[in-house]
Amino acid sequence: MISKTLLVSLFSSLTLLWIAALAPAFANTLVADLSLEEVAITTDFNGESLLLFGAVDNAQEDDIIVEFKGPALKIASRKKEQISGIWVNREAVNWRNAPSFYHLFSTRAISDFLSPEQQRELAIGYRNLGLEPQTASLPAEGLNNWIEALNRNMVERGLWFQHDGGVSINRGVLFRAPVSLPANILPGDYDVRVLHIRNGQLIAEDRTSIQVAKRGAGAFIYRVAHDYSVFYGLFAIAFAVLAGWVAAAAFRKT
């Protein structure tokens, strides 16, 4: 029986060959796609591997950047301080629009071919995500420190990362970037942006997306918990009380 991985690899290879045959006909053309259209989160979901692939015109000495961004969410960064030998949360910053997943892939270190100003213009990198704190006012230095702290936290959880050398280009036309989605990703639409860079300038750009969706019993529980949170909470309390009563009754009998 042919494995799923082998089928995906075969399909991707054939698609790459087809794209490569068309690429020379178009100047500064960039075409990208993903090996999967949807990632299903089931009860036994343990992450997923997929492949971003495509073709670009005359990129022998050029660079490719792939930005893989998940749905935005509200997230808090906390600063701990040691008081009387105990670490406690002293300060916190709540972010309105932090991406739940942010992985960058590039042919080499982005700082080798894009200056900080160019990265800012292209909105590349976690420092240029336009993160908005709910705190009314933060000095620039303080804001940067909080952004660095948020990045460290998300990197530790495998949700943000920068893969220098994560994109390979073959014969100046075909490119590919393996992508690994961890088990703790959120459902939603994941946007992919691919940039073709030459001498620090954007030559071409393409976008695609993939949906991550819960399936099966886990999807039903997730929808109930989010759409009917009050009833879900009451049911959880009632279930806990009933389970406790049954356990107590069983112990009394023994």
Residue ranges of each PLM-predicted region?
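Membrane-proximal low-complexity regions enriched in glycine and acidic/polar residues
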Residues: 88-182
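Sec/Tat signal peptide C-region and signal peptidase I cleavage site
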Residues: 22-27
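Short, aromatic-rich amphipathic segments at membrane interfaces
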Residues: 180, 203-233
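Extended, hydrophilic extramembrane loops/domains of integral membrane proteins
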Residues: 184-214
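Short edge beta-strand/loop segments characteristic of extracellular beta-sandwich folds
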Residues: 51-57, 178-180
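Juxtamembrane interface at the cytosolic side of transmembrane helices
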Residues: 240-254
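N-terminal edge beta-strand
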Residues: 28-45
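Bacterial N-terminal signal peptides
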Residues: 9-21
